[in-house]
Amino acid sequence: MTTHPSRREFFGTTAAVAAWIRLRGPHSGATGAESGGQAGGQRLPLKLGLASYSMRQFPLDQALAWAKTMGVTHMTFKDVHIPRTDPPETTRALRAKIEAAGITIMGGGTITIPNDPAQIKKEFDYAKNAGFPLIFTDPDPAALDTIEQMAKTYDIRVAIHNHGPESKNWPRPQDAYAAVKSRDKRLGLCIDIGHTLRTGTDPVAACRECRDRLYDMHVKDLAVKTDVNSQVAVGRGVIDFPGLFRTLIDIGYQGQVGLEYEINPKDPLPGMIESMAYMRGVLAAVAT
């Protein structure tokens, strides 16, 4: 049985976590393009970030304000916050707003890409205007040849996002890895550790196995390994975060470790604060 660090060891109760965030101030979190920030003055070796989908029921300004509250400076963006239907100049203006807020844009998605060259080009144009260095996607396998060519043309990475047992094409990271391992290096994976676990696959082992094409990561926790509806705040479930972070450090992972907090969409901030605090605490402990 995997032994997880006690939540109390780091932060005590949820109220203590919230107090920790308030005391540390809005600017003392993740800082610097090469770091996940600091915890207790210790510089962290991974980029702990946030998927804007966690705040999908709130406007961009609120999402950026909450990121500041949590000290987050790395984010990926869903099209609810940077709409794909906006004209290019509007997309570029939103990009400028995000960057002015001190956020490093790590990518965008998830975008469902069909086997339609014209539509694929539109998605890459959108990504370019939005400042995405990476698109994470659930693509039609038949579209991969065109996606590969566009990735080369635009010099934008594309990471296939695994979606668990319900996915016809990409249930496990290994399914995506098999499709990209012989293609251009711009094609890789966005591993969703919760969806990975639900397939009966060890997320930690999957990260190590797919390490040379691991470009992005969605982080969540589950109380029950196979239950999509059992998501909880990070650290309250069964996923081995100490093992995950040790592995990511060991393989030299350079992408974002992005919290995707999908529950409590009408009031996500307390759970995001708790999750981010736990992630920082665990990372500080394993990096010592």
Regions found by a protein language model. Name each.
Residues 2-47, 57-71, 170-173, 177-191, ...:
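Histidine-acidic metal/acid-base catalytic patches
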